[in-house]
Amino acid sequence: MHCDVLWHNAQLMTLDAADGGLGIVDDGTVACQQGRIVYAGPAAQAPALQPHATHDCQRRWISPGLIDCHTHLVYAGNRANEFEQRLRGASYADIAAAGGGIVATVRATRAADDAALLAASLPRLDAMLGEGVTTLEIKSGYGLTLDDEIKQLRVARQLAALRKVEVVPTFLGAHAVPPGGDAQRYTDQVCTQMIPAIAAQGLAEAVDVFCEHLAFSHAQAEQVFIAAQAHGLHIKIHAEQLSNQHGAELAARYGALSADHIEYLDQAGIAAMAGAGTVAVLLPGAFYFTRDTQVPPIAALRAAGVPLALATDCNPGTSPLTSPLLAMNMAATLFRMTVDECIAGFTREAARALGRSERLGRLRAGMDCDLAIWDIDAPADLVYRMGFNPLHARVLRGHLC
């Protein structure tokens, strides 16, 4: 069998085991042809391969490239000053009353042109790529006007053109009510003006909504879902982060790819997600940064068979995090997730949360050849250590990056 590239003398985490584990192969080989894996498994069982190029991995570990399935990467401005104010005793209400909070990010993002937004976002993207990310989702949501939401999504597309990475764009116009606006009037605008325009331009694959008492109601979220489906877009939701608004249950009824945050998720929501195959995207960075105490119902989600994905939730207000490795450690420490769950959460299950499980997140024939090659002794090192980046190489579609 001819192939373009062969990686050998490697230990593999295929994430393709029947038991849902890491699918470890001790002496493994990965072969790639035209950007797709043609073989991944034990070297002893490999077909006769005739590669154009070979890489001796010297017993390093190979996993699927990491996938960050929930980010707000494209924004302008800096809210470190608010962090400092909170440490000195200011409340979120105090900061918001002084013009801070999400309004500050909206103001800065609206004021920035494409070039400024791109310059601000590239370092955040580069930090993620430096830890093995090959695919990430990027949400809009800091424009809150049609032109500014389009600007964010346009910059997300530009990032993918400038770096070797796959970007999955999500429209999050229903992130917050614009300053001085009315929630229902703005929801109507999202549904009748923004979603049709963004769908027509092919700028987003999915629509997200923040369903919470301080954002959009259950009924308004459903209105957004109906509009999204009418325009052929996938559905996602920020749900049950601060209270139980039954948003995850609603999203599951509409076949949502994922429900994210879900600290206050109840049993009815879990059952609905399990029945619909909706992925639970857990965001330990936001939990940590906001000093939350309501842990997502991990054991109940496990018992129901709901897939568990992880993401950084990179954003300026509640999770200024660009490290998937640190997010894994947070998930293990704060949520008591296992090593296998943490690694699967940034590979196999993250691919599922983005509707890409047919080609990303596992090492098996037919999948895209997106790899992360690690200088580690065991998979647990990726989760156990903090402030440690053992990435040896990143591969996208069979090409070293």
UniProtKB/Swiss-Prot annotation:
GO molecular function: imidazolonepropionase activity; iron ion binding; zinc ion binding
SUPFAM superfamilies, per database record: Composite domain of metallo-dependent hydrolases (SSF51338), Metallo-dependent hydrolases (SSF51556)
Pfam families: Amidohydro_3 (PF07969)
Cofactor: Zn(2+); Fe(3+)
Binding annotation for Zn(2+): H70, H72, H238, D313
Any one of the GO BP annotations: L-histidine catabolic process to glutamate and formate
InterPro entries: Amidohydro_3 (IPR013108), HutI (IPR005920), Metal-dep_hydrolase_composite (IPR011059), Metal_Hydrolase (IPR032466)
UniProtKB keywords: Cytoplasm, Histidine metabolism, Hydrolase, Iron, Metal-binding, Zinc
Residues that coordinate or bind Fe(3+): H70, H72, H238, D313
Pathway stated in the Swiss-Prot or TrEMBL entry: Amino-acid degradation; L-histidine degradation into L-glutamate; N-formimidoyl-L-glutamate from L-histidine: step 3/3
Binding note for cofactor: Binds 1 zinc or iron ion per subunit.
Binding-site list for 4-imidazolone-5-propanoate: R79, Y142, H175, Q241, T318
Signal peptide from the UniProt entry: none
Compartments where found: Cytoplasm
EC numbers on record: 3.5.2.7
Role according to the record: Catalyzes the hydrolytic cleavage of the carbon-nitrogen bond in imidazolone-5-propanoate to yield N-formimidoyl-L-glutamate. It is the third step in the universal histidine degradation pathway.
Similarity comment: Belongs to the metallo-dependent hydrolases superfamily. HutI family.
Protein name: Imidazolonepropionase
Lineage of source species: Bacteria, Pseudomonadati, Pseudomonadota, Gammaproteobacteria, Lysobacterales
